[in-house]
Amino acid sequence: LPFQIACAPWIDAIKFSDKLNSYGMEGIRFRPLHIKPFFSVFSGEDIQGIQIFITNYKKAVLTEINFYIMQAIAELYPDRAVFDKANTNRHRMFDLVCGSDYIRKTFTQTNKVSSIQNFWRKDAETFKELSKKYYLY
């Protein structure tokens, strides 16, 4: 299930999935998940979380899913806000992936997707147009 789940020992699967579904993300649904990983992080532990389902690829804004997950974590588990707990060495990689430190710094202030959404989406349509010639399907 790589890239389909978000789980941790301290998450309540029902509350987490309900919170994420309450955001009304178009083309995306979340279902509660209870698993016991047999390798990697939390190996052998009973953990809970969500599984992500894409219901409409044309409407889903896939690049925002992780931001909504971080928002839900901050709302349900304020002592676990993602950037508050992250190793600061990891901030640089996040900033590189996002193109600047603006996303991280702004999101950290509010823990709300709405605070970064316009900035995050500002070049999306231009990118879609420029990249069309490289699509294989």
Language-model segment annotations:
Residues R121, E125-Y135:
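Flexible, low-complexity junctional segments that flank or bridge functional domains
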Residues P2, A6-F119:
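Conserved functional hotspot residues or short segments at active or partner-binding sites
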Residues D79, K85, E129, L136-Y137:
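Intrinsically disordered, low-complexity regions enriched in small/polar residues
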